[in-house]
Every structure is written in structure tokens, then in C-alpha cells.
Amino acid sequence: MGVFNYESETTSVIPAARLFKAFILEGDTLIPKVAPQAISSVENIEGNGGPGTIKKITFPEGSPFKYVKERVDEVDHANFKYSYSMIEGGALGDTLEKICNEIKIVATPDGGSILKISNKYHTKGDQEMKAEHMKAIKEKGEALLRAVESYLLAHSDAYN
């Protein structure tokens, strides 16, 4: 098994605490609402949202994947940090055992935030992880972030 790391940062005009609440803590209900073309639904299969929780994310018809299962590894409210692992379905296919993800939202002096994202791709056997595949996953995540950000800008009273 190989492990391939991919790290990225993206900025947002939304304050860190509000973005953490909307994108991470309430994302299971907000993201299907603001980006139904990307995610149809999110349901907890096991657990209450904390570490160990298993979630099933269902994608809309016409998507390349039907669903993905994720396990919550850490929810750190004080430091706006969230870690989870994709453990079944989706982009894992025949080459990946799991993908471990960490999102840390850091406040910026101008009142916005920086999302620091770390992805660890655990491949099966001696499979290689292609850079364009990692980049495509990052772009999909960024599109979800922008959908949430647009919603929050249009609804200044939401998720405060």
C-alpha cells in the first residue's frame, strides 16, 4: 500500500467560526440544499455526528458514482478542525483503500478565513495516485465551498 499526500489552501470571505458551523457542522443538510447537482443527500448510518460516525453521501442521478461512505475521525470545535475518511464507494474504485481528509479553518485578520486541506490517499498494492485525480477531487470540494459561501453571503442571518 502506498500513501500519497495532497495539501491545498483556499480562502473565504466568511469568518472561520461561521464557515465551520455551516460547511462542517451543518454541511450534511446545507450542502444538498445549495449544491443538489453535486450531492443529493447525507445520512448518518451509525453514530451521532462525532468521531466514529459513519455517513452515507448519495450523489444525484447521472453522477459518475452512486454514493460514498465516510467515517468521522475528529471534530475539534475549538480549533475549527474536522477529519474524516472515505471508506467505501465513490472515487475509491479498485485503486484506493481509503482517503483520509483533514480540514482546518483558520481566521484571517481581515475577518475571512483560510481552509487548510490535507488529503492522504491510501492505495491498494503498488497502485499510483495520479495528480489530475487528486486535483479533480480538490476542485469538487472547492465548488461545494463556494456554493456554501454564496449561500452565507446571501443569507447574512444564517449560521451565526
From Swiss-Prot:
GO terms for molecular function: abscisic acid binding; protein phosphatase inhibitor activity; signaling receptor activity. One of its GO terms (cellular component) is nucleus. Its main location: cytoplasm. Pfam families: Bet_v_1. Keywords: Allergen, Cytoplasm, Pathogenesis-related protein, Plant defense. Brassinolide binds at residues 55, 82, 84, 101. CDD domains: Bet_v1-like (cd07816). One of its GO terms (biological process) is abscisic acid-activated signaling pathway. It comes from the Eukaryota. May be a general steroid carrier protein. Belongs to the BetVI family. This is Major pollen allergen Bet v 1-C. It comes from Betula pendula. The gene is BETV1C.
